[in-house]
Amino acid sequence: MPIKPLIILPDPILREVSKPVEHVDSTIQKLADDMLETMYDAQGVGLAAIQIGIPLRMLVIDVSRNETQKNPLVIINPEILWLSDERNICKEGCLSIPEYYTEIERPKRLCVRYQDREGKQTEIEADHLLATCLQHEIDHLNGRLFIDHISKIKRDMVIRKFKKRAKEKNAQEAIL
């Protein structure tokens, strides 16, 4: 299972809306395995397929924080059924926006209908960290980033920083 390269801001692919997975088959299951390996390697708790350049409505999450007892979720074609009125503030980061963390307010609980790794339709009710991760990763599938939940001034600052970083990286690669 190969580790996939992560797409990093300001790459415009992160703003694409992902398309539904039509059939869960061995190709999709292999992609799920690759995504999990990539997420674990990057020490993340969630990863959307678009973050490795694949615009499919698919994500993986593992909030267990336990090296020995992993509890991965493979979520295909998620649909949010409801969000609670009660809110929660959680410090978020993103594998596609490395080394940037900020507090984001989101609904504390939600219910999501999705297909699992075998293609079986199921539902999950989640709260706290899992609810935050689900909302964060589903945002990715809709072309949204967690920085879209902060003020425009802060968001523009973050985008400028990552554009500058990408420009410097490209200039350095051109020299080599």
From Swiss-Prot:
InterPro entries in alphabetical order: Peptide_deformylase, Peptide_deformylase_sf
Pfam families: Pep_deformylase
Parts of the chain that traverse the membrane: none
Cofactor: Fe(2+)
Keywords tagged on the record: Hydrolase, Iron, Metal-binding, Protein biosynthesis
Active-site residues, as the UniProt record annotates them: 137
GO biological process: co-translational protein modification; translation
Residues the record lists as binding Fe cation: 94, 136, 140
Co-factor binding comment: Binds 1 Fe(2+) ion.
The protein, known as: Peptide deformylase
Its EC number(s): 3.5.1.88
Family: Belongs to the polypeptide deformylase family.
Reactions this protein catalyses: N-terminal N-formyl-L-methionyl-[peptide] + H2O = N-terminal L-methionyl-[peptide] + formate
Main function: Removes the formyl group from the N-terminal Met of newly synthesized proteins. Requires at least a dipeptide for an efficient rate of reaction. N-terminal L-methionine is a prerequisite for activity but the enzyme has broad specificity at other positions.
GO molecular function, one term: metal ion binding
Presence of the UniProt keyword Chaperone in the record: no
Cross-referenced SUPFAM superfamilies: Peptide deformylase
